[in-house]
């Protein structure tokens, strides 16, 4: 069952769900908690690789990713990151989230932003039980105009579901968890797939 606003507040008070910094009461609505945009971004550099063979040898995949991904870009509070039409960028939430082994989270974009062409997550919107860290956002501008994204703006909402019991393989205990304790806009680690 999806948690209600009252249940979310109870989970935050009890420390069952941790969100740092803790959201204000205004950020909690019927079944969700607003999350804000952090200061870190990464983009794809133009024309630095003809393609990436996603099923190729791990070393080749990683070398191609290293060529196409920018270094971390830090945007100061009050300044804007501009996402142009047809561009993909990675960013990170301001908040760090920790979930127990019996709760799964879901990230949803904001309808007001989607109506301008902004996708907040291209596909990956599940936050696994046992997750600990910031959430990487996969921005895509499918609109016609550049979009100015500013750190601290409300960028999406998290909602939570309590499972019938704790999972036996929570994310923070998995040896092969590629994004464990993520605190910045981490690029794809697909080369670590086995």
UniProtKB/Swiss-Prot annotation:
Gene3D superfamilies: 2.70.40.10. Keywords: Hydrolase, Nucleotide metabolism, Nucleotide-binding. Its EC number is 3.5.4.13. Residues 171-194 are annotated as: Disordered. One of its GO terms (biological process) is dUTP biosynthetic process. It catalyses: dCTP + H2O + H(+) = dUTP + NH4(+). The active site is at residue 138. GO terms for molecular function: dCTP deaminase activity; nucleotide binding. CDD domains: trimeric_dUTPase (cd07557). Signal peptide: none annotated. Pathway: Pyrimidine metabolism; dUMP biosynthesis; dUMP from dCTP (dUTP route): step 1/2. It is an enzyme of class 3 (hydrolase). DCTP binds at residues 110-115, 128, 136-138, 171, 178, 182. Homotrimer. Belongs to the dCTP deaminase family. Catalyzes the deamination of dCTP to dUTP. This is dCTP deaminase.
